[in-house]
Amino acid sequence: MDTSRKIIHIDMDAFYASVEQRDHPEFRGKPLIIGGDPNKRGVVATCSYEARKFGVHSAMPTRQAAKLCPNGIFIHGNMAHYVEVSNQIREIFSRYTDIIEPLSLDEAYLDVTENKKGMKSATMVAREIQQTIYRELGLTASAGVSFNKFIAKIASDFKKPAGITVVAPEEAEAFLEQIPVTKFYGVGKVTAEKLHRLGIETGADLKKWSEWDLIRELHKHGYQLYRHVRGRSNNIVNPHRDRKSVGKETTFEFNVLDNRILEQSLMKFAKKVEERLIKLQKHGKTVVLKLRYSDFTTITKRLTLNEYTNDANQIYQAAALLLRESYKGQDSIRLIGLTVTNLKPVYFENLRLEGL
C-alpha cells in the first residue's frame, strides 16, 4: 500500500446555495432551497444549512421539502453563474497543483505531493486553499487530507462546514473503524440494508469479516469494502478523467420473475442516474439495460434516443421498453442494471435543476 501521496479532497459547502446567499443579502441566514417551484414536480439540487436544519437535503422532492420547511425560499438557480464560480475555484487550485481531478462543480481531488509552492505539509496547503477561496470568493470549503482518495473524501465530510480533517497513514484504520458503513463509497440503500441485516453498522464491524465472506454476501462490493476499511484504495488523482457513462445496478437477494419488481428497480435507478447526471452537468442519448439470469447468462440491450436527456422519466421509459422487448418471464433475473451512455455537457440554458 503506497502511503507516500498527499491528496486533498475539497468539497464546497452547500455550493449553489452559498453562491446565492453571497450574491443576495436577502437570502442570508434564511432557509434557501435550489430546485424550483415546490408546487411542481422537481427535486432539490441543494439547500442552505438553514434549510438542512429542517431535514431538507439534495435529491428530495421539492414538495416534500416544502412540507418540512414551509418558510423555505425556493429558487431555480443560475447554473451558468455556478459554472463561472466553479472555474474561479479551479483557478485557485491550479496555483498549487496541475494534478486536479474534478468530480463535479463543487468538489475535486488534488494531488499536492509535489506542489507548485514547495509546501511540505498537505494540511497547510489545504488550509491555505480554504482561506484563499474565502478571501477571494466569499465562500467556504471543507477539506479532507490523506494518502488516498477514498479516505480524503470521507474526511472532507467529517467537519462540515469549513472544516479540515487530516488522516495520516498510521491513523487510517482507526479512523475508518469509527465511520458508519453508509459513508463508504459504493454503499447505497440496497447494500446498506444488506449490511444492516448482517449486523455491520461501522467500519469496525466490517473489519471483523473475512474477504471471502464479504464477497460471498456482497459480491464485488464485498471485495471493495474489504479493501476500503483497511485503507487500501486508489490513490491516483486523474486530471484527465471524463465520465463516459452513468449507471446503477443491483444483484437481488432472491432471483426475480415479477416484471413489476424489475420495473420498480429501473425507476429507482433512473432517479439515481438523473441525480448524478445533473451533478455532472451532463446528459446522454443512449440507454442501456443489463440483465443477468439465474444461470449467470448476461444480456445487454440499448436504445438511442432522438435527443439528449437527463430526465428520469424519459430514461425510465426507454429502459422499460427495452425490458418489455427483452424479458418475457422465461427465466428468473439475478441482476438488473441501467446505464446512460453517449454523454455530453449540458448547455447552461437547458440544464435541469428540476427532476421528476
Swiss-Prot record:
InterPro entries: DNA/RNA_pol_sf, DNA_pol_Y-fam_lit_finger_sf, DNA_pol_Y-fam_little_finger, DNA_polymerase-Y, DNApol_IV, PolY_HhH_motif, Rev_trsase/Diguanyl_cyclase, UmuC. CDD domains: PolY_Pol_IV_kappa. Signal peptide: none annotated. Mg(2+) binds at residues 11, 106. It catalyses: DNA(n) + a 2'-deoxyribonucleoside 5'-triphosphate = DNA(n+1) + diphosphate. Residues 1-188 form the UmuC domain. Keywords: Cytoplasm, DNA damage, DNA repair, DNA replication, DNA-binding, DNA-directed DNA polymerase, Magnesium, Metal-binding, Mutator protein, Nucleotidyltransferase, Transferase. The keyword Transmembrane helix does not apply. Binds 2 magnesium ions per subunit. It is found in: Cytoplasm. One of its GO terms (cellular component) is cytosol. Its cofactor is Mg(2+). One of its GO terms (molecular function) is damaged DNA binding. It comes from the Bacteria. SUPFAM superfamilies: DNA/RNA polymerases (SSF56672), Lesion bypass DNA polymerase (Y-family), little finger domain (SSF100879). Its EC number is 2.7.7.7. Monomer. Poorly processive, error-prone DNA polymerase involved in untargeted mutagenesis. Copies undamaged DNA at stalled replication forks, which arise in vivo from mismatched or misaligned primer ends. These misaligned primers can be extended by PolIV. Exhibits no 3'-5' exonuclease (proofreading) activity. May be involved in translesional synthesis, in conjunction with the beta clamp from PolIII. NCBIfam families: PRK02406.1 (NF002677), PRK14133.1 (NF010731). This is DNA polymerase IV. The lineage of its organism: Bacteria, Bacillati, Bacillota, Bacilli, Bacillales.
